[in-house]
Amino acid sequence: MKEKISIFTLFIFCHLFYSQNTILWKITYPENDKTSYLVGTFHQYGESFVKKYPKIEEYLSKSDAAFFENLTIDTLATNKIINSRKTDNSITKYFTKSQIEKLENYTNKSGLNLYKLTPIELLFKLQQKYTRIICTTVEKNEKNGHFDGFLIKLSDKHNVRKIGFETLEKQLELLNKQYEYFTWKNQRKNILHYFENINSSKPNKNDKENLCGFAEIYKNFDLDYQFDKSSTLKISVTERNTNWINEVIPQLKQKNVFIAVGYMHLMYKDGLINQLRKNGFIVEPEKMN
């Protein structure tokens, strides 16, 4: 009896260990013969990363429909929404004239009006660029430098129907709602850190958020899904997960579906993996190669 228990325990341990070393998950439902897949993306990795793992495109190409966070991975579309707002000069109270000039020049080159960005939006954009350039998640001259955006293009290539969980406007709304406590005053140091390092000849890869560290962890699939913990991001993660699950479950029961969303949405007690399991689906880790 002890031997049986030991073997069973070893099996469970191996299964859990293995499940932490993939971003790709297989979804089946006992009451049908459909097979779907879920991939947890890291938005700032691009085409070259995806192409290292042919299974991703293979499973996407065989799907009846593909779900993404949104279908508008377009800088111009984002800029249009932000630039349509009223001007807010409150940033000038917390940055020097020289810093404002540099930030304004930077955002102008990106087609954005500095005085129409919120603190989290500017910080988020700087962190994205920092991750791509300083953490080198995207190769030089890479055409498709966005994981999800490249998968959307692959959906078109294989004539797979695309569905977006949210609009771009909704995503910006949720981002600002989650971080509404961010101000120019309390984010000044963070904004300057990323801005200065992006423009430095000797950038510091050790940032407060450990962006480069996590990029490396993700690349090596040395992941901890923390299924026994709850997410602290109630609006941008937990609430969105619940909304997405309600939308995708009927499709999973009828079709072969491919779901591509940020890796964090697969994590935690209230992540997509656990929620699918609670709804009777079998969700199993899939080897990357």
Report residues per predicted region.
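C-terminal soluble interaction/assembly domains
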Residues: 234, 239-249, 254-289
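Hydrophobic, often amphipathic alpha-helical segments used for membrane interaction and targeting
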Residues: 78, 98-253, 271
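Short aromatic/hydrophobic-glycine micro-motifs
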Residues: 65, 112, 159-160, 276, ...
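Short, solvent-exposed loop/turn segments at secondary-structure junctions
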Residues: 44, 73-74, 170, 264-266
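A charged helix-plus-loop insertion that forms the helical arch/lid used to bind
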Residues: 84-99
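Bacterial Sec-dependent N-terminal signal peptides
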Residues: 1-25
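Start-of-domain marker
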Residues: 21-86
